[in-house]
Design a protein with these regions (language model features):
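Intrinsically disordered, low-complexity regions enriched in Ser/Pro/Gly/Gln/His and often acidic
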Residues: 14, 18, 26, 64-66
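Acyl-donor (CoA/ACP) binding surface of acyl/acetyltransferases
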Residues: 32-146
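A short hydrophobic/aromatic micro-motif that marks alpha-helical segments and, especially, helix-coil
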Residues: 10-12, 25, 131, 146
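A generic local structural motif
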Residues: 19-21, 125-126
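A generic secondary-structure signal
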Residues: 20-24, 87
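Conserved GNAT-fold acetyl-CoA-binding loop/helix
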Residues: 1-20, 31-33
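Short loop/turn motifs at secondary-structure junctions and domain boundaries
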Residues: 23-29, 117
Length: 146
């Protein structure tokens, strides 16, 4: 409900996005994953990514994620976010992983908290999503806080 991108108008748009992702996997700084069930790995139910380039000056990665409504409140997103946080600390070597959510979407904040991220504050009218201009709640975890 609180996406920062427009929904795809038809399947050709989705196919184009997926082609772009596949092409970008050749880059060393592209971090985008589909979320799938282990038993049904050909059926994505969500995605998670580093949504801004990693800030090398401070070692910061900003994460964005989404999952289909039928899979809300099942711990799937927390498992995926936790795995990506560990990957970014252990394999990429970042010092800080952060994310944000629309203040009207507290369940996203609950996912972040469950993964050890700490609430850092709300930036008023600092973001835009498909609901319009919104307040953004920021969470982060540092490498030495795991």
């Amino acid at each position: 409900k609180y996406h920062t991108w427009q929904t795809h108008g038809d399947i050709s748009v989705s196919e184009g996005v997926l082609r772009e992702w596949v092409n970008n996997y050749a880059r060393n700084d592209f971090y985008q994953w589909a979320i799938v069930f282990k038993e049904y790995s050909d059926k994505p139910i969500g995605s998670i990514a580093v949504v801004e380039n990693i800030d090398e000056t401070v070692g910061k990665a900003h994460i964005g994620y989404c999952i289909g409504k039928p899979w809300w409140h099942k711990g799937i997103m927390s498992e995926a976010l936790g795995a990506v946080i560990n990957f970014l600390f252990d394999e990429v070597g970042v010092n800080r992983v952060e994310s944000r959510h629309d203040q009207r979407n507290p369940n996203s904040g609950a996912v972040m908290k469950k993964c050890g991220m700490k609430f850092e504050g709300t930036l008023r009218q600092s973001d835009r999503n498909n609901q319009g201009i919104c307040d953004a709640c920021y969470y982060a975890i540092l490498a030495d806080e795991r």
